[in-house]
């Protein structure tokens, strides 16, 4: 067994260390224990030596017996990286003194000798491979050998607390760095996807303008662009459709009528102007449907004129179609200034229908209509009309004679 002796300074004491190295194999080779391993052994035993010196000083001040700790029967056992340490303190029977000099005037030799035995661990191939992998992983992640599991038992409680605190700091730093990298990656992905969506929409828009594709294909491309934008920005489809939708062109080619003409039509049909506009045929309707609606409007206007004719005559007899035509012509002849006042038009219409000339025309037309339908009734009506005319003619000369006699 090879042995080495050296001293470790702790305060005002120099602790002598007897280092015994167990050889490897049968040839008693101790070359495996290098100077680097010697420094590592000193670092592992430094705290144990300091605690023993402090205990010695306290026992000497208090004059009490020392605790039997780390004796030959109860040694200290530590594990380093690839070696095993067994250490204990041994009382020395001879008191030694240091040679004092100007630099070490107060230095004293510690009364206990520290005996350390170092032996190499028997590594198997699997254990060596696993340790190499752990070492490689620690080097890649930037972890020092200070956090190695093999040094767990060699550290005192205070060193373990410091190591745990350092481990917690390292974990927090790794968590923050991972979160930052993930957020940056997600942001880059979102920016890339947004740029691709915008470029795709612009390309489809340019293709739609340049090509002479039918409207159905362009609408399909617009819908695809809308869906892509919706999936990226979370916008509803209806809003995008309102933005992208183009207003349809007016293919009817019909111009809106003049306000005066609309008022004429409203007065003839006795309905508001908006109803005439709503009744106009839609450009999408077929010509047959438009003709049917026009016939219905003509029939309704004819019925309205029939009703007003009966009111103006004060009877329920039917009014022929010629009267309706004459009345419609009379209304259309009115100037535009009178058309602006519907009440004035109604008053003039009623006044004209109650005049004597229109009464004679209506009676003559009604008599013709009755002769076609019922000849007997027409004769009676004609006799009554002739009688009234004769009475009027006979009364008129007598009135003139009376006025003439009064004047003379």
From Swiss-Prot:
Ubl conjugation is among the record's keywords: yes
Keyword Cytoplasm: no
Residue positions where Phosphoserine is found in the record: 130, 213
Start-end of Polar residues biased regions: 208-219, 243-255, 374-397
Record cross-link Glycyl lysine isopeptide (Lys-Gly) (interchain with G-Cter in SUMO2), residues: 61, 79, 167, 176, 239, 242, 256, 291, 347, 356, 372, 399
Region described as Disordered: spans on this chain: 173-226, 243-313, 365-408
Biased composition annotated in UniProt, kind: Basic residues: 398-408
Record keywords: Isopeptide bond, Phosphoprotein, Ubl conjugation
Modified residues (Phosphothreonine): 392
Entries under InterPro entries matching the protein: SLX4IP
Disease: Chromosomal aberrations involving SLX4IP are found in acute lymphoblastic leukemia. A site-specific deletion within the 5' region of SLX4IP is found in 30% of childhood acute lymphoblastic leukemia in general and more than 60% of ETV6/RUNX1-rearranged acute lymphoblastic leukemia. Breakpoints within SLX4IP reveal junctions with typical characteristics of illegitimate V(D)J mediated recombination. SLX4IP deletions are significantly associated with male gender and ETV6/RUNX1-rearranged acute lymphoblastic leukemia.
Family assignment from sequence similarity: Belongs to the SLX4IP family.
Subunit-level organization: Interacts with SLX4/BTBD12; subunit of different structure-specific endonucleases.
Protein name (record): Protein SLX4IP
Species classification: Eukaryota, Metazoa, Chordata, Craniata, Vertebrata
Gene name in the database record: SLX4IP
